[in-house]
Amino acid sequence: MVKIAHLSDIHAGYTATRHLNSQGINIREADGYVALSRIVSDCIKHEVDLVVIAGDTFHTSTPSIRTIIFVQNQFRRLAAAGIPVYALAGNHDTDDIRANIAASRVLDDPLREIHSHAEPYVVHEVADGVNLHMVSHHMYMDQAITMPDIKSIPGTINIFTTHGSVIDPLLEMKLHTEQSPREIVIPDWLLKENDWDYIMLGHIHERGWVGSADGSTDTSGTRIFYNGSAIRRGFADKPCKLGRGWTLWTIGDDGSFTSEIMTVPQRPQYDFTPIDASSLSASEVTDKVIENLVSTQPEQGAEFIAATAPIVRQKIENITPGKKAALDLKAISANATHTLHWDMPSSFMSRSDNLSENSRKVSEDRTGKSNADLLKIYDEWIEDSNTLDGISEDMRENVSRKARDFVRMGQEEVLSAE
């Protein structure tokens, strides 16, 4: 029996937002360090025989000294526990320059049984009769000489590992990772013509089997598995049914492979159902946004807690520039102070959609309004007016807001005079 820990897409050194922890480290960067440390502790606890890392150990080809030292220390923890490490270079570990060396190569420490490869093709006998075939990402498509040499070894168990995209036989489309430079497609023949016992891949950040109909099991019998990323990089990474962390593979004495999904805690993320603002007032939109924000707050209210601060997004659809300018942004911001990142992207309603029969009648009802209704009159007018059509959309909201402020100041002067 052989126990293998399958890791990939650690992305050590990934940063986002400007929040720092008490040590002065970017909070999202620290999230990655915590996740890797937990994974290493799990691997040691489960007494795995080896660790396979299918690329993207680092998030960038120029990681910081802190990032390098942290990852080195984690790999050395494994080595101290008698667990060899086999890592290959992914697209984030490298750049586009042929002469440059993959950043992950600095981790190579064969005397400690830490093998971090950037070579085109390497084979390790990781246990008696078990061979690990490793193909790194660097200059992948230029490896015309290497490709014919990639072959399984008859009479042994053969595991193939590399970093890249494949064609999903169920979806009949290339699997893709957002915000991913130098993405390559693994040749189909390389996966099918070598009778691999199992294929353990990296690059796609959602864990699971290629061609799976249920997202949880190998329904298509491909024996091709992506471990997914160690942490979720905001909304660029999709939710994952199998969670994120590492995968424990056990090879039985009969050569069978069984998997156990291991997860590590993730920072909470909330992507709320978009609010359709077409039939709502600015006040109603504001209330809905705040209601959703409050649902993500800790018991203490809108208090920022670095370890658990959520990432939150609320999309607003079919809103007009005037209505968006009238949102109570101060109240919304006050209820978002607990978040690590808060985003409220909006899509504007087109003028043609907005000119309904009801809006055409608004002007007929404006005569005789009191001064107290001036802002309401302005908001109604701006929603069905063509006045702003000649202004670019990115400027329209700013112009509308400033005009509304001007009307408000005039209204306040009139009311004070009355």
Question: Where are the predicted features?
Answer:
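Accessory, non-catalytic peripheral segments of nucleic-acid enzymes
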Residues: 253-418
